[in-house]
Amino acid sequence: MLIEAIAMPIVDDASHEQFSKQPRGSHPLAVGARKRRVVWPDRSTVIESYGSRPPLNSLAKEALEAYVHWGFKNREDGQIELACAPETEAIIFDSNRHGPIESFKKLSDVESPSSVLYGSESDLSPTWFEKQAEMLGVQAEKIDGSHFFLFEDIHRAEKIIRSHFLRSSDE
């Protein structure tokens, strides 16, 4: 099951070349990661802050609480800090410009029943998901919500996942 998967088809040689030649450190997600606040007084302060602004303000309360619970570690001074250092996250976002393209190419190797789901309000191009589905021989399914649609309504997410796995087991 691919859910808002970052597997990007090559649209044309010019866009591929432009994408792969962007200078290191310029990816917007890497820039944002490097600006993250590392140390916080407590988890409730993080929940209040993250839950008050995009993109995490769209998450269900229990999803945001789980994200903060597992995404931060306790410090000896009583405060908490990000479990993943901002620079580590930035390196992941900025490391391999070919990753999404190579991931897309590997979709043709998938032999198991698959699904491709994406959010109706995603900031990613629907074309990505339609092309992924085409590679897998399935229809892309648009779900109401953002890039984080799976975490916006936990009960709906459970139903979506169960229905797709049950459908896959029947194939």
Q: Residue ranges of each PLM-predicted region?
A:
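A short, basic/aromatic alpha-helical/loop segment that forms part
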Residues: W40, D123-L124, F151-E152
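Flexible "cap/lid" loop of the alpha/beta hydrolase fold
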Residues: M1-V38, S125-P126
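Catalytic histidine-centered segment of alpha/beta-hydrolase-like enzymes
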Residues: G145-E158
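Alpha/beta-hydrolase
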Residues: A33, R37-S115
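Short, solvent-exposed loop/turn segments at secondary-structure junctions
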Residues: I6-M8, F72-K73, S120-D123, S146-F148
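Conserved loop-alpha-helix segment in the C-terminal half of the alpha/beta-hydrolase fold
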Residues: F104-S146
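Short, glycine/charged-enriched secondary-structure capping and boundary segments
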Residues: S15-Q18, F129-A133, H155-E158
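C-terminal alpha-helix
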Residues: I160-E171
